[in-house]
């Protein structure tokens, strides 16, 4: 996947469907995730004459890590991509862990809309139980994250290693309690293979992107 060089020297993986337009959709993948998870969406947008761009967040795949990043830091990366590609207005779409990053884009002056699909809610606010309805694995994961980077890094190595080599045939087992029956019903065949491939690409270099998302 093409690499885009940022001003601070880091590089991001970028997928652009090549439509010649100053308007675009910018896609934000989940946690963990990779730009390739949006491949079908980019193709569908292209068939409709709509420019679409997906990227791998800092620390995922071959996108360089941005140590200490927070959600709002995504705007600096995206702004530089928009500048280079002469995008004057865009809509952002994100799912799961990409939801907050998608919403953060509304602070970028060129943004004209944002859609969060099953996005992660805010942590630490009085009127939301962040972990309500999540699987036991998420409870363990976020509990480790709250104890610091060394603890969550060890948790990843102890519990998430299988995701680095996951295949379509074992993706449901790998997700464990994180998905329900409705998800399992559609996560088969080509959908399962695509999801597994995205996970492998996301974690091919390290767990850094996942750790920083948490």
Task: Describe the predicted segments one by one.
Residues 73-91:
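Conserved acidic catalytic loop of the alpha/beta-hydrolase fold
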């Amino acid at each position: 996947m093409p690499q885009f060089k940022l001003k601070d020297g880091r590089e991001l993986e970028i997928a652009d469907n090549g439509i010649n337009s100053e308007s675009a959709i910018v896609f934000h993948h989940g946690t963990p995730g990779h730009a390739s998870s949006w491949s079908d969406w980019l193709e569908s947008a292209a068939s409709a004459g709509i420019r679409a761009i997906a990227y791998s967040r800092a620390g995922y795949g071959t996108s360089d890590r941005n140590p200490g990043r927070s959600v709002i830091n995504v705007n600096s990366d995206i702004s530089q991509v928009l500048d280079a590609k002469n995008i004057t207005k865009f809509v952002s779409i994100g799912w799961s862990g990409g939801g907050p990053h998608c919403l953060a884009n509304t602070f970028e002056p060129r943004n004209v809309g944002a859609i969060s699909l099953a996005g992660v809610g805010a942590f630490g606010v009085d009127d939301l139980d962040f972990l309500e309805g999540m699987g036991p694995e998420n409870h363990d994961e976020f509990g480790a994250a709250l104890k610091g980077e060394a603890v969550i890094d060890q948790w990843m190595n102890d519990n998430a290693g299988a995701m680095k080599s996951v295949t379509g045939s074992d993706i449901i087992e790998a997700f464990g309690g994180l998905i329900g029956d409705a998800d399992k019903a559609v996560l088969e065949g080509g959908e399962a293979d695509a999801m597994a491939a995205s996970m492998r690409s996301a974690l091919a270099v390290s767990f850094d992107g996942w750790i920083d998302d948490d």
